[in-house]
A protein has these predicted regions:
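Non-catalytic regulatory/linker segments of enzymes
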Residues: 1-151
């Protein structure tokens, strides 16, 4: 077995373990049956993406089930998602943790779509830009009330 195949096998084994640890072994099997070439390309292309996939197996499974891996997210998708996600975050820690994890999951999706030629460069950069804009808007909205009260 050559080094590339060993690397792919190691990465996919790492994913299988992560899915099994959160009781998603059957879902991992389904992913392997339906998108193994794409998972292989992801494993070859990005150690970071595999790391994030293994950190958030539920999120990746949900992206797959909902068809998010195969379709673009038109504006104002990220503004709407961040508004919902961050609405109940009342501490700096929870707010920052939530937005960081959301960004990591979005990056996993973008890398998956990019390395598998499932999106155009224009779609990818538009989504990246919108998430950046939405993140800035969310940070301003979160910070403005305490700042107004203070000053």
């Amino acid at each position: 077995m050559d080094l590339i195949q060993q690397h792919i096998n190691h990465q996919l084994s790492f994913c299988a373990t992560a899915f099994s640890q959160v009781n998603l072994a059957a879902e991992w099997h389904t992913l392997q049956l339906q998108i193994l070439p794409q998972l292989t390309q992801l494993a070859l292309s990005s150690d970071y993406a595999i790391k994030i996939l293994c950190q958030f197996p539920h999120a990746f499974w949900q992206m797959f089930e909902q068809g998010d891996l195969a379709q673009a997210h038109p504006r104002p998708y990220y503004h709407q998602q961040l508004t919902k996600l961050l609405a109940d975050k009342t501490t700096d820690f929870l707010w920052m943790q939530s937005i960081r994890q959301y960004r990591q999951q979005a990056m996993l999706r973008w890398i998956y779509r990019d390395v598998n030629n499932l999106c155009t460069l224009a779609e990818l950069t538009d989504e990246l830009s919108e998430l950046a804009d939405a993140s800035i808007d969310a940070a301003i909205a979160y910070a403005i009330k305490p700042l107004q009260a203070r000053y």
